[in-house]
């Protein structure tokens, strides 16, 4: 009997076999003995671990795999030929429980010979390796103990659903308990919850999921509330943030206003419509400065809820509109992070308050510490501090220009030049206090103690200005005495002594000697640079020159030399008192040779009067008048030693001597030169009409 297997129950093609089966179907089904025997093997077949192992052959270890493969393949609707390959070729004995009801079944259908032949064939199939009957596979599909159930379809399929080995694509047993839906009880918060949503019954109030929530208090099915908080420092408020469609919508904690701009952006509204709606709001707060998610137009809570309901985004923005939104933030699952955020917010507030209160005290303490700083680093300290600090520690600013008391005549603080140490900024500040420190003990120069020569100060006549850099001390000591009558400040007293006299070979000093005050320590240039020479040409009544420490060494030398030459007929070098110190050190040649080059360089740097005679105002007329008081003839001077100011106004230049043609003369002498009278004749040689306008201007 060949049959075509299919997914449904296989058909029996022999019509003479169907009739007897149909006549005895109810008899077999309603027999109590058959039912009791059917249920007993079923319970045993469901649990193969309870099967007696003695019924299996020890030589066939593949019995379970083959049985499972046969039952599995029939359940899945596979044809017999395909499943036959899964069976073990070695025959093996079948369990005895599958044949224990065979005698009763044969007695019930003994009137039908064909039925009696079919049933043994089904059970002898594994032993005889005859797999040609599709009916046998369907019988075994129902169960290993039911052979005729294919003819009785009234039995439910639940009796054979659970198979112990659901392999090879078999379906898992059906689960009778349904999947849990949204519950009405607030669950224990857990970060590992596998539910689709974390219901919040405390805020949902058992609202039906099918209706649209217009209050914003109920969580939509399947949505988990996500709230973040940030501290808005500019506004001083905590903001709750809910993200929807990639847009962060914020709500303030203090007044519960909501960022309407971000709210309408979630709705996908165009910019023009959004701005028009927000501009029409009566109560709004425009924020243009701050984080991007906080910028926009903030509107009240009620208006924001109305916009959300109109745009159908209320559920999308959950839990933005929940009244007690802070409770969601304070949920136990977020307690750690929430406490950290709130603690940071409180800490910032406390720091701001404490900072405002402690600010004056910080400023006061800062000012209290200022006097303790060394005067070498604070250039505007009073002179008293400068003298006191100098007594113990040499400072680079206060005594940098004060030379050491040794023969090397080098600046005290090494690489720092006197030009930087003795800045002219301190002149005006310190010269007002000059007289306060001239007669007191604070005016003593502490250098005599530092350099270990306390007895090197001889008693000399008071000097006019003793504020000289290191290289000019020995040279200009006498010259400064010649300028005493022009000093504006009083120099009398022991404090006017030259502090440079304790060089090697110095005379014994008096015990009452008082060195000069600190004002002489601020000479800007040490070696008579061009800048100081130019200032030396300015008159004594200049603001910067009227002070005793404003005179430059080279400038004073030139001015005083010209004044003293009226009574002397010597050469360029003055008398020995001008260049010889009281201790006998003759320093004239060094000073003279040094000033030669300085004055010559300054002549090239000093601006000359231009073609216009008005530029003569650049020179100081009073200085020239003082220079011209002398009647010394011009040939007596050396061109290399005389400044150009004396050349320009010398009376010897009235005839323009030819001995000075190699020098660049000022424009004033060129303008009055007799070699230019031919200029007007040049214009008369041409017709006036043909002369250009620029040439006519010369006439």
From Swiss-Prot:
Residues 52-61, 376-423, 520-529, 566-594 have a biased composition (Polar residues). This is Cell pattern formation-associated protein StuA. GO terms for biological process: conidium formation; positive regulation of transcription by RNA polymerase II; sporulation resulting in formation of a cellular spore. Residues 1-20, 31-97, 372-594, 599-618, 674-699 are annotated as: Disordered. Belongs to the EFG1/PHD1/stuA family. The keyword Transcription applies. The gene is StuA. Residues 669-695 are annotated as: Nuclear localization domain. Residues 32-49 have a biased composition (Low complexity). SMART domains: KilA-N. The keyword DNA-binding applies. Disruption phenotype: Does not develop perithecia and sexual ascospores, and lacks conidiophores and phialides. Greatly reduces pathogenicity on wheat heads and production of secondary metabolites such as deoxynivalenol (DON) and 15-acetyldeoxynivalenol (15ADON). Leads to up-regulation of cell-cycle genes which promoters are highly enriched in StuA-response elements (StRE). GO terms for cellular component: nucleus. It is found in: Nucleus. InterPro entries: EFG1/Phd1/StuA, HTH_APSES_sf, KilA/APSES_HTH, Tscrpt_reg_HTH_APSES-type.
